[in-house]
UniProtKB/Swiss-Prot annotation:
Stored PANTHER family: UREASE ACCESSORY PROTEIN D
Disulfide bonds: none
GO CC annotation: cytoplasm
Protein name per its UniProtKB record: Urease accessory protein UreD
Alphabetical list of HAMAP family matching this protein: UreD (MF_01384)
Keyword Cytoplasm included in the entry's annotation: yes
Superkingdom of origin organism: Bacteria
Keywords: Chaperone, Cytoplasm, Nickel insertion
Region listing for Disordered, in residue ranges: 1-20, 178-201
Species annotation: Parafrankia sp. (strain EAN1pec)
Cited function: Required for maturation of urease via the functional incorporation of the urease nickel metallocenter.
Length: 297
């Protein structure tokens, strides 16, 4: 009898390391308690999406997103569900930039944000930039539903490539809808109420495609050579100040929305210049439509 153990199969030194794609969806819900203080009623982390409370007081809760692993890599499917209850204000930030990397998984990496903001509530979603590394394919999807009197501050910053390298491919989709304020049901001359129509209207539906596979992306009609692109959306009931008017400046555009709301878009050579250009209009955004952010948030 031959009792010698079988030799292990030979492994090529050039073989790609195996990695299981990651599928993770975290959840975060904030509600006011009976005393009017905001409390986190659900906080579900899912590696690598790790929300952590870091501050806030009164009706405000501040949460930072902590990355529990590198990436995302190709094929990773990540997401975050948010609910902000009536009267609460949730501020979401991240501790560092997200770097989308190439990998051996099938399809692009994805990150999906879904949020519902209740009556008289506010969501400030202000993460650090997303860097799309060379060779990466990344897709970002955001769907937000606002109550009729809810407020929103949403920032999105994209950096194409790490330092000294070209960027990868990116697709983004941003959809923000507003629930109509409840009112009396319409009636006909006969006094019978017709079937109710849709009670939700679009505020902003926007898609963006960037990367070497997009024809003319570096031309003057799109990026004009810029490596950083970003936007800030502020929406909610006006505070009685003068309406915001459309304006176009040096690589910055401000567009009022029928919401009311304001969308600011900017291009820049790097992340720092992009943030400065977006923040240059922070006074308009803060003063006209949204509560100031709490100190230390």
């Amino acid at each position: 009898m031959n009792s010698s153990a079988a030799s292990p199969p030979a492994v090529s030194p050039h073989a790609a390391p195996s990695r299981t794609t990651v599928r993770a969806r975290a959840a975060l819900q904030v509600e006011l308690d009976g005393g009017g203080t905001a409390r986190i009623t659900e906080l579900r982390a899912a590696v690598p999406v790790l929300p952590r409370r870091t501050g806030g007081s009164g009706r405000v809760v501040v949460v930072h997103l902590v990355g529990g692993a590198g990436g995302p890599l190709a094929g990773d499917d990540l997401g975050l569900d948010i609910i902000v209850g009536a009267g609460a204000h949730l501020v979401v930030r991240s501790v560092a930039a997200t770097v989308a990397l190439p990998g051996h998984g099938a399809g692009p990496s994805t990150f999906a944000l879904r949020a519902q903001v209740g009556p008289a509530a506010m969501l400030s979603f202000l993460p650090e930039p997303t860097v799309v590394a060379r060779g990466a394919r990344h897709r970002m999807t955001t769907e937000i539903i606002l109550a009729a009197d809810a407020r929103l501050r949403y920032r999105e910053e994209i950096i194409l490539g790490r330092f000294g390298e070209p960027g990868g491919d990116l697709e983004t989709s941003l959809r923000v809808d507003v629930d109509q304020a409840p009112g009396p049901a319409p009636t006909t001359d006969a006094g019978t109420a017709p079937a109710p129509g849709p009670r939700r209207r679009p505020l902003l539906h926007q898609e963006l495609r960037l990367g070497p596979r997009v024809p003319g992306v570096a031309g003057p009609a799109v990026l004009a050579g810029a490596r950083a692109v970003g936007s800030v959306l502020v929406a909610g009931p006006a505070t009685g100040l003068e309406p915001v008017t459309a304006a176009v400046g040096d690589s910055v555009a401000l567009m009022p929305l029928a919401g009311p709301g304001v969308l600011v878009c900017a291009l820049a050579d790097d992340a720092l210049a992009l943030r400065r250009r977006l923040d240059s209009l922070a006074g308009v955004l803060t003063g006209s439509l949204a509560d100031p952010l709490p100190v230390g948030s």
